[in-house]
């Protein structure tokens, strides 16, 4: 499952703004986006990922995604780094 991918990844970036910055640097292998996140927040991330040809994984819950990242709050987007 995608949550496992996040928790086992060697290097991740948490959050939409930081994920966009990482995508612009071409240093992202794939991104994980929470389905229950506000589409206004995730639209820029998913659009840029599509333009860059980066795989997009969708998970159900921001809370579970945050937990997989080791943080106490939800995460709308996470980048798994190269």
Swiss-Prot record:
InterPro entries given in the database record: Ribosomal_eL30-like_sf (IPR029064), Ribosomal_eL8/eL30/eS12/Gad45 (IPR004038), RNA_bf_YbxF-like (IPR023460)
Residue spans crossing the bilayer: none
Single Gene Ontology MF annotation: RNA binding
Intrachain disulfide bonds: none
Keywords for the protein's UniProt record, in alphabetical order: RNA-binding
Family, similarity comment: Belongs to the eukaryotic ribosomal protein eL8 family.
HAMAP family: Ribosomal_eL8_Bact (MF_00574)
Identification of the protein by name: RNA-binding protein BPUM_0095
